């Protein structure tokens, strides 16, 4: 499941739970692109649980949308990643180090308040 919806002002919530198929990936990424269109200094609040690799078709959809997704990087300056997977937390730290102007911080699933405080600061 991939669910993307507005949170408090300037924050977009992204929930990933289990496997994502091509249809869910296309709907979700199009929604994310639309929501970020006029955004500046945006914040992303990820909650990733029960992670399973997306289907091959879903990865194809993501690959086809890469030009639009790369345009989003300049519109977002912080991301909080709540996850129950240690490797996802580590990957988010590495991703944040590689993307200039984007600060990504991992959190445990029960650290909603700390994650939101990070995004607000």
Indicate where each model-derived feature is located.
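Amphipathic, Lys/Arg-enriched alpha-helical "gate/interface" segment within cytosolic domains
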Residues: 1-121
């Amino acid at each position: 499941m991939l669910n993307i919806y507005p949170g408090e002002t300037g924050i977009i919530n992204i929930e990933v739970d289990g496997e994502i198929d091509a249809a869910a990936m296309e709907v979700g990424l199009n929604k994310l692109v639309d929501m970020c269109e006029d955004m500046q200094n945006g914040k992303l609040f990820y909650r990733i649980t029960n992670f399973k690799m997306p289907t091959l078709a879903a990865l194809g959809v993501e690959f086809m949308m890469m030009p639009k997704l790369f345009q989003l990087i300049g519109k977002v300056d912080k991301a909080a990643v709540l996850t129950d997977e240690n490797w996802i937390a580590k990957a988010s730290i590495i991703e944040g180090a590689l993307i200039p102007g984007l600060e990504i911080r991992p959190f445990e699933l029960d650290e909603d308040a700390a994650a939101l405080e990070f995004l607000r600061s």
